[in-house]
């Protein structure tokens, strides 16, 4: 999902029909931060630098989060949902379901390190539905923008930077191997 994930569903502020409230205690909350607070953390300094350079008041940005929400180029956040198998082969109440939960937990524990430009603000492992699955909500950003804010929301730049890191790693392996 892009910008339409349900953080309230993920954090179980309400229960969907397909969840079992008696098993919600088995869910894991890795983080659950307010998205606006995370936007301030990521972008306030860049926003101040950008606004200081502007000579026209109509070019200044008052609230970067609201600008992204009302714009059409970027989404305020993205959500990925990861699941291994299905309810028939990895049901949450089975040993295989517990294995799936362990794998998803390990994946999440290292997600931020592997993806430094995807700022995770909400992440939950659900064990109260038919199959264990992981919700990760994140804000993609770049710190190397030459136009506009130098630090800004950009999923495209994240993928480009990831490709560059992979290519550099492959080059190191070829030259050292």
PLM region spans:
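N-terminal nicking endonuclease/strand-transfer module with a His-rich metal-binding environment
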Residues: 1-177
